[in-house]
Amino acid sequence: MLSRQALLRPARVLNTQVRTYAAAAAASSKVKPPVTLFGLDGTYATALYTAAVKTSALEPTAKAISSLGNLLAKDPKLASILETPTLSPADKSAIVAELQKSVGVSNETVKNFLATLAENNRLGLLPSVVAKFSELMSAARGEVEMVVTSAQPLDNKTLNRLESAVAKSPYVGSGKKLKVTNKVNADIIGGLVVEIGERTIDLSVSSKIAKMNKLLSEAL
């Protein structure tokens, strides 16, 4: 876990090569992202994707960004540090250097991307940019995200059975592959809530109780 002291210690301002990154992204007009993203975080994610394609470094970039996502998930305090509005140029340089060191980034595209965020005072966007970049990669790989919400964690056997059943259904297009995630929410009491792309199948106990309560209230 990164400490605040480690991130904010005095450091030399990095030679960021921001212009190199911007030029690579701008020159990628012939690269068409698999999906259109909106918002400032979507703009940065798309620029990173197109720059990575242009420099033939898409998979290494995806691996590095995934590592950054894991780091951010394990260290919630890091996000608040990134959002600090009073960071000096030296602080930003130190943060970028520590992020690169922590995830073992040697990819120039990612280095320049992080430097660009720092240069533009947008390091606070990093968590959402990572999420948006993941959307781009899933679309590029032909993946359909399936989120299974349960009251308790599901074992791999159960998840595999669900994946096999849904993969054969009309919910998943031909040639697509499922990317399964299990989320835990005790509020659903029992059962499952399955989200496939933009579709939701609510088989939770809480949903059934809500429907029953509605029927009872209408009958009274």
Curated annotation (Swiss-Prot):
It comes from the Eukaryota. Keywords: ATP synthesis, Hydrogen ion transport, Ion transport, Membrane, Mitochondrion, Mitochondrion inner membrane, Transit peptide, Transport. GO terms for cellular component: mitochondrial inner membrane; proton-transporting ATP synthase complex. It is found in: Mitochondrion; Mitochondrion inner membrane. The keyword Ion transport applies. The keyword Ion transport applies. Gene3D superfamilies: N-terminal domain of the delta subunit of the F1F0-ATP synthase (1.10.520.20). One of its GO terms (molecular function) is proton-transporting ATP synthase activity, rotational mechanism. Pfam families: OSCP. GO terms for biological process: proton motive force-driven mitochondrial ATP synthesis. F-type ATPases have 2 components, CF(1) - the catalytic core - and CF(0) - the membrane proton channel. CF(1) has five subunits: alpha(3), beta(3), gamma(1), delta(1), epsilon(1). CF(0) has three main subunits: a, b and c. Mitochondrial membrane ATP synthase (F(1)F(0) ATP synthase or Complex V) produces ATP from ADP in the presence of a proton gradient across the membrane which is generated by electron transport complexes of the respiratory chain. F-type ATPases consist of two structural domains, F(1) - containing the extramembraneous catalytic core and F(0) - containing the membrane proton channel, linked together by a central stalk and a peripheral stalk. During catalysis, ATP synthesis in the catalytic domain of F(1) is coupled via a rotary mechanism of the central stalk subunits to proton translocation. Belongs to the ATPase delta chain family. This is ATP synthase subunit 5, mitochondrial. The gene is atp-5.
